[in-house]
Amino acid sequence: MTRLTMNIAIATVIAATLAGQASAEPVKIRAGWVVAPASLIPVLFAKPGLARHQGNSYVLEPVYFSASPAQITAMSVGELEIAALGFSSFPFAVQNAGLADLRIIADEIQDGGKDNFSTHYMVKKDSGIATVADLKGKVLATNGVGTGVHMAMRAMLQRSGLQDKRDYTVIEAPFPTMKAVLLDGKADMIVSTTPFVFDPELQARARVLFTQRDAMGTSELSFWTAREGFMGKNRAAMVDLLEDSLRAVRWYLDPANRTEAIDILARFLKQPPARFESWIFSKNDFYRNPDGLVNLDALQNNIDLMRQLGIISTDLDARKHASLDLVGEAAQRLK
């Protein structure tokens, strides 16, 4: 091969490589969410300038689901890249849905973390119920049997010697209807969370008997998960996404941006801004770790409690399913 021919060949290879890189499509990352603003996924990049890698290395596609089990199904069939799961759903994804390669990659919200808001279990002020033991023979409302808040309820009552069905009755009601369920006498105790717990009438006529933190300590309510194979093939794009997401979360948490942040949420949820002003992005809200770090000790305690209550049949080591190195790398970029 002559020198000229060799140079032409090298130039051709370089040109082809550069063309391939230039035409490479950004990685589509579909991310599931269930409830906003607990999950910020649908509004994460509503503020221009936060998603600096969006459209280059990745494209984020928020996908709404009515409940966590639907995300697990979507993940199983390859229709979702990131599932926002919690302590009460993650073990089922790993143990029952065949997602042994599912990894915990970033935090979303914690109940009771850093002395922030914890879910309230409330009774009427004139009910005569002063202690958990007074719930014997009563009707208790939860948003769903088997949910995290139901598990906390069971744990707290069991601590006082009360067993489900034997000592009390559980009914189901959506969170928005809980106030009416309590005040109309359909249940003696309800579960209430943000924003419903701040309803003026509920605050005036009911009181907190205990919180979820009282029942089980800090709870890992929601965290991002992804499959190991996808992360291995698309590590750079995932780190870019996590960098942008941390930048966005920090922007939302900054008191200087609170008015604009509330306006974004209000527009998305079609609610008046006043509905959020007393609690969102404050101590009255669930804790959001600005570095995206999952509290693995809390998560392990949550999972162990599930085992003790017989909700899951085998032990699960949360740390063996955690891959927090990506979010750690993303956080380092923002320093």
For every predicted segment, state its role:
Residues 303-335:
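Conserved C-terminal helix/tail region of periplasmic/extracytoplasmic solute-binding proteins
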Residues 88, 176-268:
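Pocket-lining segment of extracytoplasmic ligand-binding domains
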Residues 18-24:
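Sec/Tat signal peptide C-region and signal peptidase I cleavage site
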Residues 1-9:
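Bacterial N-terminal signal peptides that target proteins for export
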